[in-house]
Design a protein with these regions (language model features):
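Dynamic helix-loop-helix/coil hinge segments at AAA+ ATPase domain boundaries and subdomain interfaces
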Residues: 1-19, 237-238
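Conserved alpha-helical scaffold flanking the Walker A/P-loop in AAA+ ATPase domains
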Residues: 23-26, 81-102
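Walker A/P-loop
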Residues: 26-65
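Conserved Walker
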Residues: 31, 37-40, 82-93, 107, ...
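Conserved AAA+/SF3 P-loop NTPase catalytic/coupling segment centered on the Walker-B
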Residues: 68-69, 95-122, 154-160, 175-178
Length: 335
């Protein structure tokens, strides 16, 4: 049974920033994946599926809802290890996603340790399984795409920082764009093959551009001039750690390859700045309120304690009339 066709990325209306970020992650998966933040109905999953068609394998894997750690990383058959002297590995989601796209919907609702695991493998490109003294590893290079709706919860800052790029979708498209989006969706649903043929030229041009960019990526140097510029900007943005510098530099190189250039230029650094700093930039500290000056009436209050008022805010001493001292009768002496 053939897989259902994906809506071509070239036919998506608008969302230019998100399409660029996804293409950069497809060019260099070492960037660390893309986090898409936005409400429902913004074509996040459609765009993620479209990225898979830009990769060599074209594989698109969705993380099942409620998947356990063993389902994600795979399992080792200990009984086979004892009987045959070797570990038998059953592949998990990460093995199936190798060479393609791993899509995690509502990543902010996953347990933190699973998000951490996914980010570790996405960054290293290797999945290592260790159980009871046995270990197995396999390559797991994929483009990690996570989506989240901020109304349903946030990611911890430590996990948020580990996503390479972040794109925030907000606002509603113009009426003309809305109509065109619906028109293209209806055409695709009515006859997917005819729609794919209609957009075949634009889709193939986009695929070839990504292929050329991946092939030319290694020839573009991560030069000191670009690194120094990025380091200055990260410092000015108050970014914690060095992950932003590394991701920004890699994304700028991928953007240069996307343009077909041979070196990183200022326009490449500018083009990806928001993607790298959107979730890492620290807000400027709020200015402290100016201390209130005492009123003129308070300032003119006499401070001489001899006038009976003492310091401002203190009540003057009051003379309290005391009654006569009573003499208690003494105890009678013992006879």
């Amino acid at each position: 049974m053939s897989a259902l066709p994906h809506f071509p990325l070239a036919a998506v209306v608008g969302a230019d920033e998100l399409k660029l970020a996804l293409c950069l992650a497809a060019i260099d998966p070492a960037i660390g994946g893309v986090l898409i933040e936005g409400p429902r109905g913004m074509a996040k999953s459609t765009l993620a599926r479209g990225v898979a068609d830009l990769l060599d394998g074209g594989r698109f894997v969705t993380l099942p809802l409620g998947a356990s750690e063993e389902r994600i990383v795979g399992t080792l058959d200990l009984d086979a290890a004892l009987g045959e002297g070797r570990a038998q590995f059953s592949p998990g989601v990460l093995a199936h996603a190798h060479g393609g796209v791993l899509y995690v919907d509502e990543v902010n609702l996953l347990p933190d340790h699973l998000v951490d695991l996914l980010l570790d493998v996405a960054a290293s490109g290797v999945n290592l399984i260790e159980r009871d003294g046995l270990s197995h590893s396999h390559p797991a290079r994929f483009v990690l795409i996570g989506t989240m709706n901020p109304e349903e919860g946030e990611l911890r800052p430590q996990l948020l920082d580990r996503f390479g790029l972040k794109v925030q979708l907000h606002g509603t498209p113009a009426p003309s764009e809305r109509a065109e989006i619906v028109r293209r969706r209806l055409a695709f649903d009515a006859d997917p093959q005819a729609f794919l043929i209609q957009w075949q030229g634009a889709q193939q041009a986009l695929q070839q551009r990504c292929v050329d960019a991946r092939q030319g990526l290694a020839a573009i140097a991560l030069d000191d001039a670009a690194l120094n510029e990025i380091a200055e900007r990260c410092h000015a943005a108050g970014v914690d750690g060095l992950r932003a510098d590394l991701v920004w530099l890699r994304a700028a190189r991928a953007h240069a390859a996307w343009r077909g250039a041979n070196a990183i230029e200022a326009q490449d650094i500018e083009a990806v700045e928001h993607f790298a700093l959107a979730h890492r930039r620290r807000p400027a500290p709020a200015q402290s309120a100016t201390p209130q000056q005492p009123s003129s009436r308070q300032a003119q209050a006499p401070s001489n304690a001899s006038n009976g008022e003492g310091q401002w805010g203190e009540l003057p001493a009051q003379n309290v009339t005391m009654g006569e001292r009573r003499q208690l009768p003494g105890w009678p002496k013992k006879p």
